[in-house]
Amino acid sequence: MKAAYFRTTGSPDVIEFGDLPEPVCGDDQVIVKVGAVSVNPIDTYIRNGANYWPLPNPFIPGCDFAGEIVAMGPQVKHLSIGQRVWGSNQGLMGRQGTFAELAAIDSKWLHPSPEFTDDTEMAAIALVGITAHLGLFQHAMLQPGETIFVRGGTGGVGSMVVQMAKAIGAVVITTAGNPTKHAKCRELGADYIINYNESNVAEEIKQAAPNGVNVFWETLREPDFELAVGAMSEEGRMILMAGRDARPPFPVGPFYVKGCSMHGFAMFKASAEQQHVCASDINHWMTSDILKAQIDRVLPLSETAQAHRLQEASTLQKQSLLSGKIVLKV
């Protein structure tokens, strides 16, 4: 089968595209004929040598996937050959990833694809959608009528947070760096959009939410705790999902006096059961046209190395090249 893979960690140049043996289906696994995958920052960190866990050699990267079941192990009873499925949490914890024509995946990580969606959409929404849902509803416990600030409303996770928060009736404040992204945030449902290149973000948040925001979702790899604590309401909740190596200053005094709380989480540590709860809502919202995948561009799988370069330019070099996900067609 054709696959994107690497044998040693390093720059995107270590990624090869070629033939690898087809995967063997385990007893409680399925073989998915992959239709589309998407690129996430963690894919680039692993490829660059982040020492999270030992990697198989060769290693196929990729967390997200959408495609069709073509084979099943004898213990799989709740799925069927020919069924369209989507999911994430691959290429992690030592598991092989999805950037290949075929992927052997434990059945517990699979979710049925909604009717009238395509593989490109479901691959684009997988990790970022599950991440947003976990943070909003299992950690921040966002309620209808509350106010949330999320940085970067057109980003992969940010765009999901905006849409999901609006879906339950929250007030959404977000940021955008140019008029095009401002318009996209408005289209996604944001109530207040702050141009961080032209305005003082802290002052604009105070104008939009005089009593503070109930939830502050930080997407930066270097969290701005001064901004967050100043912007939060009494008993405000801060969500952290990035910044593994960050060690920024922290304003302890106002944080505890307000009775705030901080919730950090890594999506890939959520159980399959927790992720199924997320997937159920995602499927419902996709079917109801409430939630839409945000795709910046679609490339062939053979251009995985270039996709990694683009992702790194956006994530690490902060070039704001992307407005949505990079999807690879298989």
Locate the predicted segments by residue.
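Short amphipathic alpha-helix with an adjacent loop that forms part of the alpha/beta core around
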Residues: 200-210
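Mid-domain Rossmann-like dinucleotide-binding core that forms the NAD(H)/NADP(H) cofactor-binding site
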Residues: 122-198
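N-terminal Rossmann-like NAD(P) cofactor-binding module of classical short-chain dehydrogenase/reductase
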Residues: 86, 149, 214-217, 239
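NAD(P)H dinucleotide-binding glycine-rich loop of Rossmann-like/cofactor-binding domains
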Residues: 78, 88-152
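Glycine-rich phosphate-binding loop and adjacent beta-alpha segment
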Residues: 223-292, 329-330
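Glycine-rich beta-strand-centered segment in the early N-terminal region that forms part
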Residues: 21-38, 50-91
